[in-house]
Curated annotation (Swiss-Prot):
The organism's taxonomic lineage, starting at the top: Bacteria, Bacillati, Actinomycetota, Actinomycetes, Mycobacteriales
Coiled coil ranges: none
Listed name of the protein: Aspartate 1-decarboxylase
Encoding gene per record: panD
NCBIfam families registered for this protein in UniProt: panD
Main location: cytoplasm
Amino acid sequence: MLRTMLKSKIHRATVTQSDLHYVGSVTIDADLMDAADLIEGEQVTIVDIDNGNRLVTYAITGARGSGVIGINGAAAHLVHPGDLVILIAYGTMEDAEARAYQPRVVFVDADNRQVHLGADPAMVPDTAVDLMSPR
């Protein structure tokens, strides 16, 4: 049996730009893509914390160190600059791999710089004072 599992997420990133007339996708700072083990063209789900919108698109690489999180194409109607988002990638794997897999969970600051990298999707780092763990 195959299971679809959390592969990686970038938690509470701030959208820095949007371009309605771009062909689509989400532009992500290359440093964050590396931290989250994302590659260009990989499917990602965007969850907008501010308005509850969810959408599926694909990642493209932004300038390294820029902090860019850019919403492109029609998604710009749903997600806006300044919104807090969670970027999620899932992987499909066999049961044994799924049970052992360690996702990459990236927390960022207000400038979209990595402040914590972990593997527990429910863990909240000490620096995230506004968040509560479900555990």
